[in-house]
Regions:
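Alpha-helical scaffold domains
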Residues: 1-172
Length: 172
């Protein structure tokens, strides 16, 4: 726990007025310290691949601590236990954080297809958006079968206009 306190102190010290102002302007999910991404990356290098820090950092609920948790484990996303990941996906978490989690962690895991299916079955639009993001990544890897592509295109054609705007952009 001392290590988490040290990390949080580093985040407080790295706070920047311009970043705080930007977060306020865009209505970012609080709490946050206003740490620029470059400073976060620099702090993350000290703790790289220490996956045991992911959960305690995430549980602080602090925006930059969650970004940092992602940065620390992004090179070895399969080290994270699925149950820890599942408990970190919450509608209270910043959409930007969840997007980063999907991009840098979920999409690079061996079980990313399972995450796609799980997220697409959730009621919350933000989770479905993450599921569609993972589906797009799957298609981009060119491993989808012709049948999967056809089924997805048919689904998009039938549902695009009535789908939550949060999901529409990814579907397009």
């Amino acid at each position: 726990m001392t290590e988490i306190k040290t990390i949080l102190s580093q985040l407080v010290e790295a706070s920047h007025a311009g970043t705080l102002k930007r977060y306020d302007k865009i209505g970012e999910t609080k709490p946050y310290y206003g740490v620029p991404m470059g400073a976060l990356s620099k702090i993350a290098k000290t703790y790289i691949n220490q996956s045991d820090l992911f959960v305690p950092l995430w549980q602080t609920g602090i925006l930059e601590a969650q970004y940092l948790a992602i940065q620390i484990v992004k090179n070895k996303p399969d080290q994270l236990v699925a149950s820890d990941l599942k408990s970190s996906i919450s509608k209270q978490v910043s959409h930007n954080i969840l997007d980063k989690l999907a991009s840098l962690i979920l999409s690079k895991r061996r079980d990313s297809k399972d995450w796609e299916e799980y997220l697409l079955t959730q009621d919350q639009a933000i989770f479905q958006r993450l599921g569609w993001f993972l589906r797009a990544k799957y298609f981009a890897r060119k491993t989808a079968t012709d049948q999967e592509i056809e089924q997805t295109l048919t689904y998009i054609e039938e549902h695009l206009k009535t789908t939550d705007p949060l999901i529409q952009w990814i579907m397009k």
